[in-house]
């Protein structure tokens, strides 16, 4: 199954969107596709001799082949480690749709697939006038949902899926990522999620200790049709 561009969102912040996106990039590359990542808006950046840099965006850059310029991967790098809308206000920056679309177009010219990682959960806005649904519509790409497996994941997963669909967008798959290694009844919860979510299931990632190379997990994810 040959995939094209898609947007990775999650049921919350801190549920592994970046790590899953890196795994997906390695999976695509393993299939012979040129795949690059994009983090349109990132907060919590640190300053270096090359400018403001975000850890998640750097991870996406490292997982990409070819390797795009950082400014294309992360057009808006915001210092404060808070919600992007607040971070942009503090930085005196207005997040605009046009630069994001332009960067995506340039990345698309370099690769077969662009994996675009969102911010926080699906309903997290990008500025006062548009949210992630607005960006996804502008890019004309579908959505992949990362479900963080922990207590409350059923509610979060169903609400996120319903919100994506209510926005009129296509959700082509969901991935279960174990956040809490001590979560009770993981398999039972996973089975219920597979029954209740009306979108294709792409696979389950166990709890991953820090330092694991995402390339080693590329075979664990299986988009529908594999």
Curated annotation (Swiss-Prot):
Pfam families: AAA_26 (PF13500). The active site is at residue 39. Keywords: ATP-binding, Biotin biosynthesis, Cytoplasm, Ligase, Magnesium, Metal-binding, Nucleotide-binding. GO terms for cellular component: cytosol. Substrate binds at residue 43. It is an enzyme of class 6 (ligase). Pathway: Cofactor biosynthesis; biotin biosynthesis; biotin from 7,8-diaminononanoate: step 1/2. Transmembrane segments: none annotated. One of its GO terms (biological process) is biotin biosynthetic process. It comes from the Bacteria. Its EC number is 6.3.3.3. GO terms for molecular function: ATP binding; dethiobiotin synthase activity; magnesium ion binding. CDD domains: DTBS (cd03109). Its cofactor is Mg(2+). It is found in: Cytoplasm. It catalyses: (7R,8S)-7,8-diammoniononanoate + CO2 + ATP = (4R,5S)-dethiobiotin + ADP + phosphate + 3 H(+). Mg(2+) binds at residues 18, 56, 117. ATP binds at residues 14-19, 56, 117-120, 177-178, 206-208, 213. Homodimer. Catalyzes a mechanistically unusual reaction, the ATP-dependent insertion of CO2 between the N7 and N8 nitrogen atoms of 7,8-diaminopelargonic acid (DAPA, also called 7,8-diammoniononanoate) to form a ureido ring. Belongs to the dethiobiotin synthetase family. NCBIfam families: bioD. This is ATP-dependent dethiobiotin synthetase BioD. It comes from Xylella fastidiosa (strain Temecula1 / ATCC 700964). The lineage of its organism: Bacteria, Pseudomonadati, Pseudomonadota, Gammaproteobacteria, Lysobacterales.
